[in-house]
A protein has these predicted regions:
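Conformationally flexible catalytic loops at phosphate/diphosphate-handling active centers
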Residues: 1-9
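Acidic/Gly/His-enriched mid-domain segments of enzyme catalytic cores or analogous surface patches
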Residues: 8-45
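Conserved alpha/beta-domain cores
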Residues: 34-348
Length: 348
Protein backbone atom coordinates (compact mmCIF):
# COMPACT_ATOMS: atom_id res chain seq x y z
CA UNK A 1 0.00 0.00 0.00
CA UNK A 2 1.58 3.26 -1.14
CA UNK A 3 1.44 6.24 1.23
CA UNK A 4 1.92 9.92 0.46
CA UNK A 5 4.32 11.69 2.82
CA UNK A 6 4.94 15.42 3.15
CA UNK A 7 8.07 16.49 5.04
CA UNK A 8 7.66 20.08 6.27
CA UNK A 9 11.14 21.22 7.25
CA UNK A 10 9.94 24.66 8.29
CA UNK A 11 7.52 23.29 10.90
CA UNK A 12 9.41 20.10 11.72
CA UNK A 13 6.41 17.97 10.75
CA UNK A 14 5.84 14.74 8.81
CA UNK A 15 2.36 14.47 7.29
CA UNK A 16 1.06 11.03 6.24
CA UNK A 17 -1.61 10.89 3.51
CA UNK A 18 -2.64 14.55 3.84
CA UNK A 19 -6.03 15.70 2.54
CA UNK A 20 -6.00 16.52 -1.22
CA UNK A 21 -6.52 20.24 -0.56
CA UNK A 22 -3.53 20.30 1.84
CA UNK A 23 -1.37 18.34 -0.61
CA UNK A 24 -2.28 20.84 -3.33
CA UNK A 25 -1.22 23.71 -1.04
CA UNK A 26 2.17 22.07 -0.41
CA UNK A 27 2.67 21.54 -4.14
CA UNK A 28 1.98 25.26 -4.65
CA UNK A 29 4.53 26.12 -1.93
CA UNK A 30 7.13 23.86 -3.58
CA UNK A 31 6.54 25.63 -6.90
CA UNK A 32 6.97 29.03 -5.20
CA UNK A 33 10.16 27.85 -3.48
CA UNK A 34 11.63 26.68 -6.78
CA UNK A 35 10.76 29.98 -8.45
CA UNK A 36 12.33 31.97 -5.62
CA UNK A 37 15.48 29.83 -5.77
CA UNK A 38 15.83 30.58 -9.50
CA UNK A 39 15.40 34.32 -8.91
CA UNK A 40 17.95 34.25 -6.08
CA UNK A 41 20.52 32.39 -8.17
CA UNK A 42 20.44 35.24 -10.71
CA UNK A 43 21.74 37.64 -8.02
CA UNK A 44 24.17 35.36 -6.23
CA UNK A 45 27.32 36.61 -7.98
CA UNK A 46 26.41 40.27 -7.50
CA UNK A 47 27.80 42.21 -4.50
CA UNK A 48 25.89 41.87 -1.23
CA UNK A 49 24.57 45.38 -0.73
CA UNK A 50 21.44 47.26 0.28
CA UNK A 51 19.37 49.40 -2.10
CA UNK A 52 21.38 52.40 -0.89
CA UNK A 53 24.61 50.73 -2.06
CA UNK A 54 25.87 50.07 1.49
CA UNK A 55 27.80 46.79 1.58
CA UNK A 56 26.89 43.90 3.85
CA UNK A 57 29.38 41.09 4.40
CA UNK A 58 27.90 37.69 3.63
CA UNK A 59 30.11 35.02 5.18
CA UNK A 60 29.92 31.24 5.30
CA UNK A 61 29.53 28.88 8.25
CA UNK A 62 31.87 26.09 7.18
CA UNK A 63 33.30 22.75 8.24
CA UNK A 64 30.76 20.25 6.95
CA UNK A 65 31.43 20.00 3.19
CA UNK A 66 34.77 21.35 1.84
CA UNK A 67 33.82 20.66 -1.80
CA UNK A 68 30.57 22.62 -1.56
CA UNK A 69 32.26 25.40 0.41
CA UNK A 70 34.96 25.82 -2.23
CA UNK A 71 32.29 26.24 -4.94
CA UNK A 72 30.79 29.13 -2.97
CA UNK A 73 34.14 30.94 -2.85
CA UNK A 74 33.35 33.73 -5.33
CA UNK A 75 29.87 34.30 -3.86
CA UNK A 76 30.91 35.02 -0.25
CA UNK A 77 33.14 37.48 1.57
CA UNK A 78 34.99 34.85 3.60
CA UNK A 79 34.51 32.21 6.29
CA UNK A 80 32.67 33.67 9.27
CA UNK A 81 32.72 30.45 11.29
CA UNK A 82 34.75 27.29 10.67
CA UNK A 83 33.67 24.52 13.04
CA UNK A 84 36.98 22.89 13.96
CA UNK A 85 35.19 20.26 16.07
CA UNK A 86 33.92 18.41 12.98
CA UNK A 87 37.28 16.68 12.20
CA UNK A 88 37.60 15.86 15.93
CA UNK A 89 34.17 14.20 15.88
CA UNK A 90 34.99 12.07 12.82
CA UNK A 91 38.11 10.47 14.31
CA UNK A 92 38.68 7.78 16.94
CA UNK A 93 41.13 9.96 18.89
CA UNK A 94 42.38 13.53 19.18
CA UNK A 95 43.94 14.63 15.84
CA UNK A 96 47.65 15.38 16.10
CA UNK A 97 49.05 18.88 15.71
CA UNK A 98 50.32 17.97 12.22
CA UNK A 99 46.90 16.68 11.17
CA UNK A 100 45.30 19.89 12.40
CA UNK A 101 47.87 22.05 10.57
CA UNK A 102 46.97 20.29 7.30
CA UNK A 103 43.25 20.71 7.97
CA UNK A 104 43.42 24.44 8.73
CA UNK A 105 45.95 25.16 6.00
CA UNK A 106 43.53 23.74 3.46
CA UNK A 107 40.80 26.17 4.52
CA UNK A 108 43.10 29.21 4.90
CA UNK A 109 44.64 28.63 1.47
CA UNK A 110 41.29 27.88 -0.20
CA UNK A 111 40.17 31.39 0.79
CA UNK A 112 43.63 32.99 0.93
CA UNK A 113 42.39 36.41 -0.24
CA UNK A 114 39.53 36.49 2.28
CA UNK A 115 39.24 36.40 6.08
CA UNK A 116 38.82 32.96 7.65
CA UNK A 117 37.56 32.61 11.22
CA UNK A 118 38.43 29.34 12.95
CA UNK A 119 36.48 28.60 16.13
CA UNK A 120 38.43 26.70 18.77
CA UNK A 121 37.13 23.29 19.80
CA UNK A 122 33.45 23.57 20.73
CA UNK A 123 32.26 20.24 22.13
CA UNK A 124 29.96 19.20 24.95
CA UNK A 125 26.16 19.31 25.19
CA UNK A 126 24.87 18.05 21.79
CA UNK A 127 28.37 17.74 20.26
CA UNK A 128 30.17 14.76 21.77
CA UNK A 129 33.56 13.23 20.99
CA UNK A 130 33.36 9.40 20.95
CA UNK A 131 36.74 9.16 22.71
CA UNK A 132 35.92 11.77 25.40
CA UNK A 133 32.40 10.96 26.63
CA UNK A 134 30.85 13.58 28.90
CA UNK A 135 27.83 12.51 30.94
CA UNK A 136 26.01 15.30 32.76
CA UNK A 137 22.48 15.87 34.03
CA UNK A 138 22.29 19.30 32.40
CA UNK A 139 24.85 19.38 29.56
CA UNK A 140 23.67 22.70 28.10
CA UNK A 141 24.81 24.38 31.32
CA UNK A 142 27.76 22.09 31.86
CA UNK A 143 31.28 21.36 30.69
CA UNK A 144 31.44 22.61 27.11
CA UNK A 145 33.21 25.01 24.73
CA UNK A 146 36.05 27.08 26.18
CA UNK A 147 35.40 25.56 29.63
CA UNK A 148 36.75 22.21 28.43
CA UNK A 149 39.79 23.55 26.60
CA UNK A 150 40.86 25.88 29.43
CA UNK A 151 40.52 22.99 31.89
CA UNK A 152 42.71 20.92 29.54
CA UNK A 153 45.10 23.61 28.20
CA UNK A 154 47.25 21.14 26.27
CA UNK A 155 44.32 20.51 23.90
CA UNK A 156 43.95 24.28 23.43
CA UNK A 157 47.69 24.89 22.94
CA UNK A 158 48.04 22.13 20.34
CA UNK A 159 45.07 23.46 18.40
CA UNK A 160 46.17 27.11 18.51
CA UNK A 161 49.74 26.20 17.53
CA UNK A 162 48.31 24.33 14.54
CA UNK A 163 46.21 27.36 13.58
CA UNK A 164 49.18 29.75 13.85
CA UNK A 165 51.45 27.45 11.83
CA UNK A 166 48.77 27.06 9.15
CA UNK A 167 48.39 30.85 9.01
CA UNK A 168 52.11 31.64 8.72
CA UNK A 169 51.99 31.89 4.92
CA UNK A 170 48.52 33.38 4.35
CA UNK A 171 47.93 35.74 7.30
CA UNK A 172 44.12 35.67 6.94
CA UNK A 173 43.27 33.92 10.23
CA UNK A 174 40.92 35.06 12.97
CA UNK A 175 40.41 32.94 16.10
CA UNK A 176 36.98 32.68 17.73
CA UNK A 177 36.44 31.49 21.32
CA UNK A 178 33.15 29.62 22.03
CA UNK A 179 30.90 29.61 25.10
CA UNK A 180 32.73 32.43 26.88
CA UNK A 181 31.02 33.48 30.12
CA UNK A 182 33.59 35.67 31.88
CA UNK A 183 36.49 38.07 31.34
CA UNK A 184 38.79 35.64 33.20
CA UNK A 185 38.32 33.07 30.42
CA UNK A 186 39.30 35.60 27.75
CA UNK A 187 42.41 36.67 29.67
CA UNK A 188 43.49 33.05 30.17
CA UNK A 189 42.86 32.22 26.48
CA UNK A 190 44.90 35.26 25.41
CA UNK A 191 47.81 34.14 27.61
CA UNK A 192 47.73 30.68 26.04
CA UNK A 193 47.50 32.12 22.50
CA UNK A 194 50.55 34.33 23.20
CA UNK A 195 52.43 31.32 24.54
CA UNK A 196 51.49 29.27 21.46
CA UNK A 197 52.73 32.13 19.24
CA UNK A 198 56.12 32.19 20.98
CA UNK A 199 56.42 28.41 20.69
CA UNK A 200 55.63 28.48 16.96
CA UNK A 201 58.16 31.27 16.31
CA UNK A 202 60.84 29.30 18.16
CA UNK A 203 59.95 26.23 16.12
CA UNK A 204 60.04 27.86 12.65
CA UNK A 205 62.63 30.54 13.36
CA UNK A 206 60.79 33.66 12.18
CA UNK A 207 58.00 36.01 13.28
CA UNK A 208 54.44 35.03 12.40
CA UNK A 209 51.36 37.24 11.88
CA UNK A 210 49.15 37.48 14.96
CA UNK A 211 45.49 36.62 14.25
CA UNK A 212 42.52 38.75 15.18
CA UNK A 213 40.76 37.42 18.28
CA UNK A 214 37.03 37.28 18.87
CA UNK A 215 34.48 35.69 21.19
CA UNK A 216 31.16 34.04 20.54
CA UNK A 217 28.52 36.12 22.29
CA UNK A 218 26.06 33.37 23.14
CA UNK A 219 25.79 33.51 26.94
CA UNK A 220 23.58 36.29 28.38
CA UNK A 221 26.25 37.38 30.91
CA UNK A 222 28.45 38.66 28.09
CA UNK A 223 25.69 40.91 26.72
CA UNK A 224 26.41 43.18 29.70
CA UNK A 225 30.22 43.00 29.47
CA UNK A 226 30.95 44.70 26.14
CA UNK A 227 32.74 47.69 27.72
CA UNK A 228 35.17 45.26 29.38
CA UNK A 229 35.55 43.20 26.19
CA UNK A 230 36.53 46.17 24.03
CA UNK A 231 40.18 46.34 25.13
CA UNK A 232 40.68 42.57 25.02
CA UNK A 233 39.31 41.41 21.67
CA UNK A 234 38.98 42.51 18.05
CA UNK A 235 35.44 41.33 17.32
CA UNK A 236 32.36 39.60 18.69
CA UNK A 237 30.27 37.06 16.82
CA UNK A 238 26.72 36.77 18.13
CA UNK A 239 25.68 33.12 18.28
CA UNK A 240 21.93 33.56 18.16
CA UNK A 241 21.13 29.83 18.50
CA UNK A 242 22.55 29.46 22.01
CA UNK A 243 21.85 33.06 23.02
CA UNK A 244 18.15 32.48 22.30
CA UNK A 245 18.23 29.17 24.15
CA UNK A 246 19.79 30.68 27.26
CA UNK A 247 17.71 33.86 27.28
CA UNK A 248 14.47 31.86 27.08
CA UNK A 249 15.64 28.90 29.25
CA UNK A 250 14.55 26.55 26.45
CA UNK A 251 16.53 23.47 25.39
CA UNK A 252 15.99 23.47 21.62
CA UNK A 253 16.81 19.74 21.48
CA UNK A 254 14.08 18.86 23.99
CA UNK A 255 10.92 18.02 22.04
CA UNK A 256 8.67 18.95 24.98
CA UNK A 257 9.75 22.60 24.94
CA UNK A 258 11.35 23.06 21.50
CA UNK A 259 8.25 24.89 20.24
CA UNK A 260 9.00 27.65 22.78
CA UNK A 261 12.39 28.30 21.16
CA UNK A 262 11.83 31.56 19.29
CA UNK A 263 14.53 33.78 17.77
CA UNK A 264 11.99 36.58 17.22
CA UNK A 265 10.94 36.69 20.87
CA UNK A 266 10.91 40.38 21.90
CA UNK A 267 13.51 39.71 24.63
CA UNK A 268 15.91 38.23 22.06
CA UNK A 269 15.45 41.19 19.73
CA UNK A 270 16.07 43.65 22.58
CA UNK A 271 19.25 41.80 23.53
CA UNK A 272 20.43 41.98 19.90
CA UNK A 273 19.65 45.71 19.82
CA UNK A 274 21.62 46.26 23.05
CA UNK A 275 24.59 44.33 21.64
CA UNK A 276 24.58 46.33 18.38
CA UNK A 277 24.34 49.63 20.28
CA UNK A 278 27.18 48.80 22.68
CA UNK A 279 29.40 47.33 19.96
CA UNK A 280 29.17 50.59 18.02
CA UNK A 281 29.67 52.67 21.16
CA UNK A 282 32.82 50.82 22.20
CA UNK A 283 34.24 50.28 18.71
CA UNK A 284 33.93 46.50 18.57
CA UNK A 285 33.66 44.78 15.18
CA UNK A 286 30.17 43.19 15.22
CA UNK A 287 29.25 39.92 13.51
CA UNK A 288 26.37 37.47 13.73
CA UNK A 289 26.59 33.77 12.90
CA UNK A 290 23.46 31.98 14.12
CA UNK A 291 20.51 30.61 12.15
CA UNK A 292 18.95 34.09 12.14
CA UNK A 293 21.66 35.29 9.72
CA UNK A 294 20.33 32.96 7.03
CA UNK A 295 16.62 33.40 7.75
CA UNK A 296 14.98 35.91 5.36
CA UNK A 297 12.32 36.63 8.01
CA UNK A 298 15.03 37.85 10.39
CA UNK A 299 17.53 39.51 8.04
CA UNK A 300 15.57 42.74 7.47
CA UNK A 301 15.20 43.24 11.24
CA UNK A 302 18.93 42.54 11.77
CA UNK A 303 19.83 45.13 9.13
CA UNK A 304 17.54 47.63 10.85
CA UNK A 305 19.28 46.93 14.17
CA UNK A 306 22.68 47.69 12.63
CA UNK A 307 24.13 44.27 11.75
CA UNK A 308 26.27 44.37 8.59
CA UNK A 309 28.26 41.15 8.90
CA UNK A 310 26.18 37.96 8.59
CA UNK A 311 27.56 34.41 8.53
CA UNK A 312 25.28 31.60 7.37
CA UNK A 313 25.05 28.11 5.93
CA UNK A 314 25.71 27.71 2.22
CA UNK A 315 22.09 27.04 1.28
CA UNK A 316 21.08 30.50 2.57
CA UNK A 317 23.65 32.60 0.68
CA UNK A 318 21.71 33.11 -2.56
CA UNK A 319 18.40 34.04 -0.92
CA UNK A 320 19.96 36.40 1.62
CA UNK A 321 21.93 38.24 -1.09
CA UNK A 322 18.75 38.50 -3.18
CA UNK A 323 16.88 39.97 -0.20
CA UNK A 324 19.67 42.38 0.81
CA UNK A 325 19.66 44.03 -2.61
CA UNK A 326 15.98 44.85 -2.11
CA UNK A 327 16.14 46.19 1.45
CA UNK A 328 15.48 49.88 1.96
CA UNK A 329 17.46 50.91 5.06
CA UNK A 330 14.81 53.33 6.34
CA UNK A 331 12.10 50.67 6.02
CA UNK A 332 14.35 48.15 7.81
CA UNK A 333 15.00 50.58 10.66
CA UNK A 334 11.29 51.28 11.00
CA UNK A 335 10.56 47.53 11.07
CA UNK A 336 13.19 46.98 13.76
CA UNK A 337 11.77 49.87 15.83
CA UNK A 338 8.28 48.37 15.66
CA UNK A 339 9.67 44.93 16.51
CA UNK A 340 11.40 46.29 19.62
CA UNK A 341 8.08 47.76 20.77
CA UNK A 342 6.32 44.39 20.41
CA UNK A 343 5.17 42.54 23.51
CA UNK A 344 4.75 39.17 21.79
CA UNK A 345 6.34 37.42 18.82
CA UNK A 346 3.01 37.47 16.94
CA UNK A 347 3.27 41.27 16.84
CA UNK A 348 6.74 41.06 15.27
Amino acid sequence: HRRTLVVDGYRGELLVDPEPVLLQEYQRLISEENELSKLAEDDVNLPAQLKSGERVKVMLNAGLSPEHEEKLGSRIDGIGLYRTEIPFMLQSGFPSEEEQVAQYQGMLQMFNDKPVTLRTLDVGADKQLPYMPISEENPCLGWRGIRITLDQPEIFLIQVRAMLRANAATGNLSILLPMVTSIDEIDEARRLIERAGREVEEMIGYAIPRPRLGVMLEVPSMVFMLPQLASRIDFISVGTNDLTQYLLAVDRNNTRVASMYDSLHPAVLRALAMIAHDAERFGIDLRLCGEMAGDPMCVTILIGLGYRHLSMNGRSVARVKYLLRRIDIEEAQELSRRSLDAQMTAEV
